[in-house]
Design a protein with these regions (language model features):
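Amphipathic alpha-helical scaffolding segments comprising HEAT/armadillo-like alpha-solenoid repeats
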Residues: 615-619, 648-650
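Acidic carboxylate motifs that coordinate Ca2+ or other divalent cations, activating on Asp/Glu
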Residues: 520, 562-564, 592-594, 629, ...
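Strongly charged, low-complexity linkers/loops
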Residues: 617-628, 640
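Short, flexible domain-boundary/linker segments around small modular repeats
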Residues: 552-559, 563, 618, 628
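Hydrophobic, ordered structural segments
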Residues: 558-562, 567-595, 599-611
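Structured alpha-helical subdomains that flank or immediately precede key functional sites
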Residues: 1-544, 549-554, 561, 569-573, ...
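Extended alpha-helical assembly domains of large eukaryotic scaffold proteins
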Residues: 550, 600-603, 616
């Protein structure tokens, strides 16, 4: 219940504007300005109790307390490492970022790309902090985390060994913004070791709030050059790299002066007239300096002598940048990563802005964790979303009528769980064309038969998923306006009037009731429990742990028209009729004859009983009524249906104008919640 309330509160806060870069959420409820002011007034340096200078902040395995790698580690402030520490000297540059004893080169490549865009860097590294007059041993950074920006406060105690920084450091040794940024990112993810291993796209997204794509250039699509130009026109960040095949390959320099395993930035793409034909060129920047491409189209190559003067004016390169032909680029580089930025990140009006939609959801065993296509009987249970694209792209180089969009799917908080033995799941998505009969409809969750008979139109990379629990964030970026929303069943119920009056009860049932009810001719919840459990105990075709007193109270509350907390003859007959109907549905949907229902079978049984429910409601029902092995026995099935029917009937009774909403004061809400 607390988790559901927290989710609702978070959604409302985001809708109110919290979680933007300008109004970031205070991570761990720590307020940078307040904490700094407190330290300055007290004359002390900040020590962060939420990410202490202690072994648990380093790691859990290779950087764990008993690892040789962490022996002799001391946490020191920059002032203890050099006489004149600086936060940023002369602007953030590539030489500020040197890798230490941590496998987070993916993160460093993303940080290096930040240095190429001052506006983006300023969103991650807020101004107004350093080692000057207001120094108090406290710094803060901002990261995008699954749909919201968080402001992360740290102290400046950094792990060192033999007097040197253990992890990221600057080449000069007196500049500390990159080391402090890495520490803040480690805090968000639980510890330093949690940062080991990853992709630059993850860093791109966390530093920009954008959506990242990755292309293997040996399998580049035929329109790769157009994709690059379109990305540059939209102000995207583009990074490229050459894969390494062994540890010895790392930082190896090719014959034409390209460095393997390092991240480059792609900053331009043009076509020039060259010897009577069009030549495609790309401009690449080496954030690591030192070496630069010496092949065709490099700075002093002869190819430039055959380019029109007008074209040459439009083809410029700054220091550290070089041009190469697009074909050479595809041949030498292994991977291209594109991060499309959100409109609020782009300050230059010349860039084309994309339209964005974001949804947070989850996979839960038994309800919405349907797994991959290898699980055809549950695949349909996965969360579904419908995307409607109405406007054609503005693309003069493309004669096809089409609408471009990018889908990004990220799983939440998995790095933080590494400390407890968890890791990333393999996840993915598939895109299907909406059947014509469902055009214009949104409240439709496509069923198993659809996915058994229709092929996907596009998908993410192949993945194997065993239907694990997890939380995710789905985003859709499109060039033109689009509509994206969950594709879910509406909440509705067909509640049949099964009321049996006293006069309609036959003599046989009347005699049975007289025997069961006793002198007062009424059945209490406790008596109902005894009756129901005697009946189900005789059946071998259904499994049950027996009806609980709580379930029997729900039954009585639903059937008790008089309000005395007991069932009379007609009320008991109505209940019995209802239970018999539920038993028929239960048996019908127990497809394997096991005596229990699986959670997918329960979903179909609920529909047959007259209830259509959203994924979120199914998650709650499975969490409440399923056994540990994700099966539903008969008593839990009846309990679920009884509570659902009672809640629907109460709501409909209060919603007199059938508006779909009701208003309750706190006392009324408590009254109904405690039924």
């Amino acid at each position: 219940m607390a988790g559901i309330a927290s989710t609702l509160a978070k959604k409302r806060a985001l809708a109110a504007g919290f979680g933007t870069n300008a109004n970031a959420v205070k991570y761990m409820n720590q307020d940078f300005e307040a904490l700094r002011s407190q330290c300055l007034s007290q004359g002390g340096l900040f020590s962060d109790p939420t990410f202490p200078a202690a072994p648990q902040s380093l790691g859990f395995n290779e950087l764990g307390p008993s690892s040789y790698k962490t022996r002799g580690v001391q946490w020191k402030r920059p002032g203890e490492l050099c006489s004149n520490p600086e936060f940023i000297v002369g602007g953030a540059t590539r030489t500020d970022i040197c890798q230490g004893a941590l496998g987070d080169c993916w993160l460093l490549a993303a940080i290096a790309s930040l240095t190429l865009n001052e506006d983006v860097l300023a969103r991650v590294v807020p101004s107004g902090q350093g080692f000057g007059d207001n120094y108090a041993g406290i710094f803060h950074f901002q990261f995008w985390q699954f749909g919201e920006w968080v402001d992360v406060v740290i102290d400046d105690r950094l792990p060192t060994k033999d007097g040197e920084l253990l992890f990221v450091h600057s080449a000069e040794g007196s500049e500390f913004w990159s080391a402090l940024l890495e520490k803040a990112y480690a805090k968000v993810n639980g510890c330093y070791e949690a940062l080991s291993g990853g992709s630059t796209t993850e860093g791109f997204e966390d530093f920009t709030g954008g959506i990242a794509e990755s292309y293997e250039l040996r399998r580049a699509p035929s329109n790769m050059f157009q994709i690059i130009r379109k990305a540059l026109d939209s102000g995207a960040l583009l990074g490229c790299s050459i894969d390494i095949t062994s540890a010895a390959d790392s930082e190896a320099v090719t014959r034409q002066k390209l460095v393997k395993g390092h991240a480059y930035s792609l900053t331009g793409a043009v076509e020039v007239n060259y010897r009577g034909r069009k030549e495609k060129l790309v401009r690449v920047r080496n954030p690591w300096g030192q070496v630069e491409w010496t092949g065709a189209w490099s700075d002093n190559s002869t190819e430039w002598n055959y380019v029109d003067a007008a074209d040459r004016q439009n083809v410029k390169a700054d220091d550290g940048e070089f041009w190469m032909s697009f074909q050479e680029f595809l041949r030498h580089y292994s991977r291209l990563e594109i991060c499309t930025l959100t409109p609020d990140t782009l300050t230059d009006d010349s860039f084309k802005h994309w339209s964005i939609c974001k949804y947070d959801s989850s996979w839960r065993k038994g309800s919405t964790a349907g797994g991959c296509r290898n699980h055809p009987h549950t695949f349909w249970m996965n969360p579904q979303f419908v995307i409607k694209l109405d406007e054609e792209d503005d693309d003069p180089d493309d004669n096809e009528v089409g609408c471009s969009f990018v889908v990004g799917l990220i799983q939440k908080n998995r790095r933080r769980l590494r400390k407890v033995g968890e890791d990333m799941h393999t996840i993915g998505f598939a895109i299907y064309e909406v059947p014509s009969q469902f055009h214009g409809q949104r409240e439709v969750h496509l069923d198993k038969n659809y996915f058994l008979t229709h092929a996907q139109k596009a998908r993410s990379e192949t993945f194997i998923n065993l239907r694990e629990d997890g939380d995710f964030c789905l985003r859709v970026f499109s060039e033109k306006q689009h509509e994206t929303q969950p594709c879910d069943d509406p909440i509705d119920a067909t509640l049949n009037d099964e009321t049996v009056s006293d006069d309609e009860v036959d003599a046989g049932f009347r005699g049975l009731f007289t025997k069961l009810a006793g002198p007062d001719m009424e059945i209490s919840a406790a008596e109902l429990k005894t009756i129901m459990n005697k009946i189900v105990a005789k059946r071998t075709d259904i499994k049950t742990d027996g009806f609980s007193l709580e379930t029997c109270r729900v039954m009585v509350n639903l059937m008790d028209d008089s309000g005395n907390g007991k069932l009379g003859l007609g009320e008991f007959a109505t209940l019995w009729k209802k239970v018999q109907r539920y038993l028929g549905i239960y048996k019908k949907n127990d497809l394997d004859g096991s005596g229990t229902m699986s959670t997918p079978e329960m979903r179909m049984a609920l529909k047959e009983a007259g209830f259509t429910l959203t994924n979120n409601i199914h998650q709650i029902l499975v969490a409440r009524y399923a056994e540990g092995d994700m099966t539903i026995d008969f008593d839990n099935f009846v309990a679920c249906l009884m509570r659902l029917e009672m809640m629907f009937r109460v709501f409909k009774k209060i919603d007199t104008d059938d508006s779909g909403s009701i208003e309750l004061d706190f006392h009324q809400w408590l009254t109904f919640a405690m039924i």
